[in-house]
Amino acid sequence: MNCTEELESRIAKAEKRYGPFASTHEAMGVMLEEWTELVDAVRSNMLIDIREEALDLAAVCIRLADNLHDIEAMRARSVK
């Protein structure tokens, strides 16, 4: 499976399991968690894990961008 297909699969699974992000802050928290896991994999020089974590991070970023198609709804959920 190529990266694009893997991303599509990960995004679909996450949307089915979790639905849209509750807020931009939730998305940022998930991104930071994935970023930390990617950093750990890079520091360990574990190439398979690096690929997996890079795809996980990319999927979260794309999900956030997709969730912003309805900016007003996201804004309402993201107000302090």
Regions found by a protein language model. Name each.
Residues 1-80:
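Flexible "arm" and connector segments at domain edges
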